[in-house]
């Protein structure tokens, strides 16, 4: 890799890192609070990083998102679950890193087979989004069943039905 492309990648990575930090820390920019939960659009930035820069950089940008999600949960929680749930790096960091991994790998595999950027990007975006939503909600439900069920006002036995409804709603919006 020549110096120009190393510099280019460094600058793009820095810009995407700054965007992630802004989206995470500025209210309503990346996390949109809706009642006791928040919708996020930040995964789009991670997916773009994975598609444009590759899997490794997508994972790095996802790591930045996860770390700043955890910092935000400690410093300025926006929902009742933030302080209890998103201070756990298994929930705040791991799914975000895996968004970059899944999106980057799928884009690379599909692009190599089809040479179609748009198709590879669409599949990477869909599965990157699903990765974040499913992992965060599943980990929340499994690690904090009682707390999450109580917060959503449902019985623990009905928690995963409720979380499934949230996942579907997030997928549509």
Segments from the language model and where they lie:
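Loop-helix junctions at membrane interfaces
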Residues: 1-173
